[in-house]
Amino acid sequence: HLLSRRQRQMCIRDRFMMTLDDAVDLVVYAFEHGRNGDLFVQKAPAATLVTLATALKELYGKDTPVKIIGTRHGEKLYETLVTREEMARAEDMDNYYRIPCDSRDLNYDKFFVEGSEVVSQIEDYHSHNTHRLDVEEMKQLLLKLDIVREDLNLN
């Protein structure tokens, strides 16, 4: 079982949530809509692992204690998928961002003369400003995974 009877506790952090099917959809979408050098980012929901742990406990009917272990040395507090510099040139394609290849030259004098203040007014796309899954949404996402469905004998 994913939550074994002997497991004493779950340790948690924050992360984006993406199923294998979502990853395949992203690759197919990029092939169909991309140009050479483009970067595609799915607008994936995020969740704290407290939400994940709670959803797993509810699905499995277990009362496994959860221990919040905090940030490890060198670990970021959130995950950035698109920087504000990339967001300044990104194309919003509904469920994805398309970031075209940055083909500017390295003429820095041009930047200082023609620089843009727009970048300083744009926010990164990261795990703290995307949709956060609640426990019910997380359970629905988990139930899309064959490993969970098989483990719960739902297939």
Kindly give the residue locations of the regions a language model identified.
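Single conserved hydrophobic/aromatic residue that forms the stacking wall/gate
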Residues: 1-12
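Substrate-positioning beta->alpha
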Residues: 13-28, 48-55
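Short acidic (Asp/Glu) and glycine-rich catalytic loops that position anionic groups and cofactors
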Residues: 6, 32-36, 117-121
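Mid/C-terminal beta-alpha module of Rossmann-like enzyme folds, strongest
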Residues: 33-98, 105, 140-144, 149-154
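Glycine-rich phosphate/pyrophosphate-binding loop
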Residues: 92-145
